[in-house]
Amino acid sequence: MDEKDLAAQPEEAGQDPRLPGPHEDPRRQEGAEAQAAEGPLAPHAQGERLKRPPPAPGGKLVSLKGDRAFQRLRKGKAGRGRYVSVKWLPAPELRVGIVVSKKVGKAVVRNKVKRRLREILRRLHLPKAHLLVVASPEAREASYVELFQDVARALKKSGLIQ
């Protein structure tokens, strides 16, 4: 095509000559423009944000940080289960440290165990204390329910919960 041919084609104002208009596509159904004005893509629905469900009871856990906090916990009350061991000391607020060594597995597996333990501790509604939870290598094989029961058992043995 030469420039002469392009200049010879009349171009409608504001439309790209390469793309067919909505009325020119033979596959397009009649009235399709009206459907777009309703439903999830409607102009009034585009600005609205989806509402999040309310958070589960318990809220976010505060992490135990610093070597000194972990050192103090060595003298704390202890409890042990099949998959975890716990140590705790009374404190003005609940702080949790979760330790999952490389013996448990690669990073993906360790993070999965940590996520499960955080959720379990959040759901247990623990009293104010500094708490250390150390996962054993067997924790990678445990189901969520087994891990939950084991953490609860270890916390009962240590005296943190009844």
Curated annotation (Swiss-Prot):
It catalyses: Endonucleolytic cleavage of RNA, removing 5'-extranucleotides from tRNA precursor. GO terms for biological process: tRNA 5'-leader removal. Gene3D superfamilies: 3.30.230.10. It comes from the Bacteria. The open reading frame (ORF) for this protein entirely encompasses the ORF for the 50S ribosomal protein L34 (rpmH). The two start codons are separated by four nucleotides. PANTHER family: RIBONUCLEASE P PROTEIN COMPONENT. RNaseP catalyzes the removal of the 5'-leader sequence from pre-tRNA to produce the mature 5'-terminus. It can also cleave other RNA substrates such as 4.5S RNA. The protein component plays an auxiliary but essential role in vivo by binding to the 5'-leader sequence and broadening the substrate specificity of the ribozyme. This is Ribonuclease P protein component. It comes from Thermus brockianus. The lineage of its organism: Bacteria, Thermotogati, Deinococcota, Deinococci, Thermales.
